[in-house]
Amino acid sequence: MKIVPPRGMQDFLPHEKEHRDRITEVIYKSYISHGFNPIETPSLENIERLACGVGQENEKLTYKIIRRGLTGAQTVQHPDELIDLGLRFDLTIPLVRFWNTNRARLPKIFRSLQIGHVWRAEKPQKGRRRQFIQCDIDIIGQPEILAEIELLVATLSTLEQLGIRTPKLHINDRRILFSMLNNLGVPHSCHVYVSIVLDKLRKIGLDLVKQELCEFPALVAYLASSVNSNTGSTDLCFDVSSTKDITHIRRTIQSALPHGCKFDCEDLCRIIASVNEFTQTGVFFDPLLVRGMGYYTGPIFEILHDDYSIAGGGRYDGLVERLGGLPTPACGFSIGFERVLGLIKESVSLDPKKMILLYDPKVDPNLVVSVKLEFISKGFIVRPELASRSRRNQIELAKREGFGAFLYLDPLSPPDGLLAKVKPIL
């Protein structure tokens, strides 16, 4: 029997879990300060909701749950009815279901905060596991661009608190993307397929993308002239971080689009100007930015660090209605926790109120518990540990876990005055 976790999943040692919890706490407190309300949704959703077509490629990666109580004959005769549930592959679809279920008890404009696990049955690689954490904020019921501005400013502020100070914000609009595809001869019926292929540009490279899109020669020619074939990065990422002048931003966006491609980009220009007003982040208009989910309908954005995506989101106005609710505007942003974690060096600071209680084997167990409870009442974190012959090694190991103090308890230790005998770990 294998003793390792399933492929693409991971155990975390105590010090690793503490490090992850510290980062989660920073994200949580930052988003709370921006007025977002924490919620929790189930890990499982009905399969018809997860497979409704809005998740695009991620729907193929859904972990599916076989219905309980089926007989062998049912399993063979009705294979399509085997599955009724699946593990969520993102937090947005569960959020929309949550909104449709609880709408009457929620504010008209609802600011949601979710931090939780999601699952995708994909090939594990660096920075990509089958079980991972997403940190999502969403605003449901707000049609104005204030939603996008709030989400962007809150997320960039949170990343700064985590010590990530040089991210780049890439921004586009799904409507600009589709207008550009129309201009390049891609029929409306092929927009979703072409978007899926373009979204894989960084992963599979220009040559493979050109092969998959060979039936659209104008688009292939546009890509060949604007994409670095070695890196998959686009030469059309126009820097719009140096100005709050909406007219200048509008001209920059129009100059990035193919000749003859026109679109009202006023909202996008105002969003960019506002981000420049409130943050020092580099902002780039990227006409080839897609974002993988099929539910996006308007502005879309992605935050990169060293050309590595660490967060992304956008507006998805049609999703609430598509999943059974009333027409409702919505917009969201998600931090990829595992990717952000990789940018933050784990550091251990010694806590003087975190104490290891070393006790002699002859000490009465009731005394150990009594001393432990006494120090807990004084605000200490206490871990009893049987003293070994090499107490120095024990203390050194405790130090690596952030313990900043220790106390040695022997049978002759007086019950009073123990606080004065606590020694710092240096």
Curated annotation (Swiss-Prot):
<comment type="similarity">
    <text>Belongs to the class-II aminoacyl-tRNA synthetase family.</text>
</comment>
<comment type="subunit">
    <text>Homodimer.</text>
</comment>
<dbReference type="GO" id="GO:0004821">
    <property type="term" value="F:histidine-tRNA ligase activity"/>
</dbReference>
<dbReference type="InterPro" id="IPR006195">
    <property type="entry name" value="aa-tRNA-synth_II"/>
</dbReference>
<keyword id="KW-0436">Ligase</keyword>
<dbReference type="InterPro" id="IPR004516">
    <property type="entry name" value="HisRS/HisZ"/>
</dbReference>
<dbReference type="Pfam" id="PF13393">
    <property type="entry name" value="tRNA-synt_His"/>
</dbReference>
<keyword id="KW-0030">Aminoacyl-tRNA synthetase</keyword>
<dbReference type="GO" id="GO:0006427">
    <property type="term" value="P:histidyl-tRNA aminoacylation"/>
</dbReference>
<dbReference type="GO" id="GO:0005524">
    <property type="term" value="F:ATP binding"/>
</dbReference>
<keyword id="KW-0547">Nucleotide-binding</keyword>
<dbReference type="InterPro" id="IPR015807">
    <property type="entry name" value="His-tRNA-ligase"/>
</dbReference>
<keyword id="KW-0067">ATP-binding</keyword>
<keyword id="KW-0648">Protein biosynthesis</keyword>
<dbReference type="InterPro" id="IPR045864">
    <property type="entry name" value="aa-tRNA-synth_II/BPL/LPL"/>
</dbReference>
<dbReference type="GO" id="GO:0005737">
    <property type="term" value="C:cytoplasm"/>
</dbReference>
<keyword id="KW-0963">Cytoplasm</keyword>
<dbReference type="InterPro" id="IPR041715">
    <property type="entry name" value="HisRS-like_core"/>
</dbReference>
<protein>
    <recommendedName>
        <fullName>Probable histidine--tRNA ligase</fullName>
        <ecNumber>6.1.1.21</ecNumber>
    </recommendedName>
</protein>
